[in-house]
Amino acid sequence: MTSQRSPLAPLLLLSLHGVAASLEVSESPGSIQVARGQPAVLPCTFTTSAALINLNVIWMVTPLSNANQPEQVILYQGGQMFDGAPRFHGRVGFTGTMPATNVSIFINNTQLSDTGTYQCLVNNLPDIGGRNIGVTGLTVLVPPSAPHCQIQGSQDIGSDVILLCSSEEGIPRPTYLWEKLDNTLKLPPTATQDQVQGTVTIRNISALSSGLYQCVASNAIGTSTCLLDLQVISPQPRNIGLIAGAIGTGAVIIIFCIALILGAFFYWRSKNKEEEEEEIPNEIREDDLPPKCSSAKAFHTEISSSDNNTLTSSNAYNSRYWSNNPKVHRNTESVSHFSDLGQSFSFHSGNANIPSIYANGTHLVPGQHKTLVVTANRGSSPQVMSRSNGSVSRKPRPPHTHSYTISHATLERIGAVPVMVPAQSRAGSLV
């Protein structure tokens, strides 16, 4: 058998060749990094089986700072180039002469805002098959700006301080390294460093902590430094005058407050005492009327004692001071007495023939030879009222007494004067 070639075979081969020769954009490197201010080349190549008469190329960018707003970078269409967004004017162009299968572009004087994702869209009619988009990422690197160094905290000896270092710009984000500019280039033993945050914490600073410190900010494309002078302050003598003044002022204030409190207390106490005194009853009781006859006088001997003596008097209406009864002269019971020392006195008539005088119920004897009987009691026993021969007396209990008599002549010689005294009620009030 002989094989026969089909007449359709060449047409099939041409058809397969056309499919294989359709437009295809080459793989991109993925990402390109460039320092700010340096030119960047974004590659994009393709293959096609058709002529480049109808070539159409569009470059688009999706900014990193605003992913929702894609922008046109450059356009080639119908044999002409057109500018894209205003910020790319004068900085963007194709690397080769157009039309060509290499549609790469360049960006001069790259800026931080140029960072983003770039897309290359290629169309060349009649080729319509295959992948016609290429994607390239652009990252504009920024070296660290000059860092700013500062000290946070008190620089007094024994305190804790924090050294801060930061750069406003830097892509990628810079790291920070602190060092002390001395022979060892090492930080103090009490220091802890955070290279990401750019801080150094030095605890319990001392004189050895003083010195010049340097912060180095660095990233992939550059470094930058700043210097910081740390001077630990030694203790200063305090102002004794200010301290003494403050203490004195505080003491005066405290004393004033204490005096104010004491004054208020004593005022309150005296006020309460006055109110209590006002509540105590002070009644004067009248036991009986005074004698109606002015000529009739009752004589009363008043003796004061310096040691807790109490004066009492006999009743002018119920007692007989003077009597012509001889028994009266021998009666030693007292007419009046003093309670504490126990001394009591009685007046008696020395002449029984002298007539007695009664005035308003009172028996008076104005004769001569009058005597005074004194009864002394050394005890402190309570006293009771007693009545004997018309005379009223208080005698102590128990009755351990010593009596003696004072003659009328002796009374006249010492200047004794008969007086009238008010009587006492049972409650002790004078009337």
From Swiss-Prot:
Segments of this protein annotated with the region Disordered: 379-402
Keywords: Cell adhesion, Cell membrane, Disulfide bond, Glycoprotein, Growth regulation, Immunoglobulin domain, Membrane, Methylation, Receptor, Repeat, Signal, Transmembrane, Transmembrane helix
Any one biological process term the GO annotation gives: positive regulation of long-term synaptic potentiation
Residues that bear Omega-N-methylarginine: R378
Predominant cellular place of this UniProt entry's protein: membrane
Residues listed as glycosylation sites in the UniProt record: N102
Record's compositionally biased regions (Polar residues): 379-392
Disulfide bond annotation, renumbered to this chain: C44-C120, C165-C215
Topological domain ranges for the Cytoplasmic compartment: 263-431
Signal peptide: 1-22
Domain Ig-like C2-type: 144-234
TM annotation in the entry: 242-262
GO cellular component terms, A-Z: cell-cell junction; plasma membrane; synapse
GO molecular function: ionotropic glutamate receptor binding
Membrane topology: Single-pass type I membrane protein
InterPro entries in alphabetical order: Ig-like_dom (IPR007110), Ig-like_dom_sf (IPR036179), Ig-like_fold (IPR013783), Ig_sub (IPR003599), Ig_sub2 (IPR003598), Ig_V-set (IPR013106), IGSF11 (IPR042758)
Cell location: Cell membrane
Domain Ig-like V-type, residue spans: 23-136
Additional comment: The last 20 cytoplasmic amino acids are not required for the cell adhesion function.
Physiological role: Functions as a cell adhesion molecule through homophilic interaction. Stimulates cell growth.
Protein name per UniProt: Immunoglobulin superfamily member 11
Source organism: Homo sapiens
Gene encoding the protein: IGSF11
